[in-house]
Amino acid sequence: MILQTKDLRFSYSKKGAPVLEDVSLSLHSGERLGLWAPSGRGKTTLCRLLAGYERPQKGEVLLDGKPLSAYAGPCPVQMVWQHPETVVDPLLPLGKTLAESGMPEQRLLDALHIREGWLTRYPGELSGGELQRFCLARALHPAVKFLLCDESTAMLDLVTQAQIWDFLLREAASRDLGLLVVSHSAALLERVCTRTITMPE
């Protein structure tokens, strides 16, 4: 499969300057594409467009030549955010949060070292690294084909970063997933990606 953007233009207001202008890229199944740029260049906005959270004013986001909206059921493009606490309901136990989109396979919970006792706990009772493991398990449902990692490990300690990337690279290889890895760290992108591009100014 291939995930593509063609000549994307996007701004957050009709009169505002565009955050993205004429942005085109392609990501193939099994590829690990790194995306580097300084802050404020529109990396997160691009991920939001690719995952269907926003719609461009111009251009298209296509999955195998079809608009993302044409795919029924769970979205085949998922995003893992930098701050996991912002994308989970603080009032729901984490087991219920996972079950909302279909309980992940037990092998994923085991591989991510998610303990059974954590399922009854609330987001505020877990560390950032523990919570990010939940978000990864939730994103990696069977229908997913492309995973967008937007600074997903930037706030974590080095040991947890290494554990998560080791898991992600193995999971992506076994399922032929396409990964888009957004990071300020050129060293990380060099280590985990098959190619890297820089966001234009």
Please tell me what each predicted stretch does.
Residues 1-5, 9-22, 29:
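A short, flexible loop at the N-terminus of ABC-type nucleotide-binding domains that lies
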Residues 36-38:
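The feature captures the beta-strand-to-loop junction immediately N-terminal to the Walker
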Residues 51:
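Helix-to-loop junction immediately C-terminal to a conserved catalytic motif
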Residues 66-78, 92, 96:
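ABC ATPase NBD coupling module
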Residues 83, 90-105:
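Q-loop/switch helix immediately C-terminal to the Walker
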Residues 105-117:
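Conserved ABC ATPase "signature" region
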Residues 122-126, 130:
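Conserved ABC ATPase signature
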